[in-house]
Regions:
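Short linear motifs at protein or domain termini
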Residues: 1-107, 114
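Short helix-capping and inter-helix turn/linker motifs at the boundaries of alpha-helical repeat units
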Residues: 11, 142, 186-190
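Charged, amphipathic alpha-helical interaction segments
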Residues: 21, 41, 60, 110, ...
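Short amphipathic alpha-helical interaction/hinge segments
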Residues: 83, 175, 179-183, 222-226
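Conserved amphipathic alpha-helical segments that form helical-bundle/coiled-coil interaction surfaces
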Residues: 101-180, 191-197, 209-219
Length: 226
């Protein structure tokens, strides 16, 4: 009988990291709120403040919080943020960044739309419909771009692939400027029309139609950057 390996003991920092991650991911600490102070967390869990500080740094590396010196640790719950920062360093040129982001979306999103057509729930479809209605009525450029991004993020979530959803969110935030340029040049009506066609394909549970509608939408977006 082979010897049994001794159990791996987690460090106090890992324990604190697990507890804080659970509070954020379970929704007990909402996005935009501040974590309890280092002292409060250290007393609550009988840990040193150094251990709590290290756990906060690891949370920031994962995109779950942002450390704001002099203010506290703010919950951001954005796992895409570290990837986004890496891409910003790799692609310092705004124009090249926008072009490559649009190309990446064209490769990723049609398949996400096809998967979402199979997995979409009535609740998810209602949320997309509400988003379309809000976009049609919106007149502010920045809010229109935010609604556009939210529509695509929601489809990625419906597709059920967390890896691709995080990748898409990273790319979407980097390419936000291209959305604002497109909305400014063509108005909301064009984007809204594409979204309505995508939503119709999702509601019909038609993966091929959803893939095609998304592909046409993103080909137009890529063409806008030419």
């Amino acid at each position: 009988v082979p010897p049994t390996a001794p159990p791996v003991r987690s460090s106090p920092a890992d324990d604190a990291l697990r507890k804080l991650s659970a509070l954020i991911e379970d929704g007990a600490l909402a996005t935009g709120t501040l974590l309890p102070s280092e002292r409060q967390l250290a007393e609550r869990w009988s840990l040193s403040r150094v251990v709590v500080r290290e756990a906060a740094r690891k949370l920031e590396q994962r995109g779950l919080v942002t450390i704001r010196h002099g203010i506290g640790v703010e919950v951001t719950n954005n796992p895409a943020l570290p990837v986004q920062h890496t891409l910003e360093r790799l692609l310092p040129s705004d124009q090249e960044r926008l072009r490559q982001c649009a190309q990446a979306r064209l490769l990723i999103e049609p398949e996400l739309a096809a998967a979402a057509a199979v997995r979409a729930t009535p609740k998810g479809l209602r949320a997309l419909k509400a988003n379309c209605a809000a976009l049609a009525a919106e007149t502010d450029l920045a809010r229109s771009a935010a609604l556009d991004i939210a529509f695509h993020d929601a489809i990625a979530d419906l597709a059920g692939n967390k890896v691709l959803a995080v990748m898409l969110r990273s790319v979407a935030q980097l390419g936000r400027l291209s959305r604002e340029v497109t909305l400014q040049r063509f108005g909301v009506a064009r984007a809204h029309g594409y979204h309505v066609r995508i939503l119709a394909a999702l509601a019909a549970a038609d993966p091929a139609a959803a893939r095609k509608a998304m592909k046409l939408h993103l080909e137009a977006a890529l063409g806008d950057l030419a």
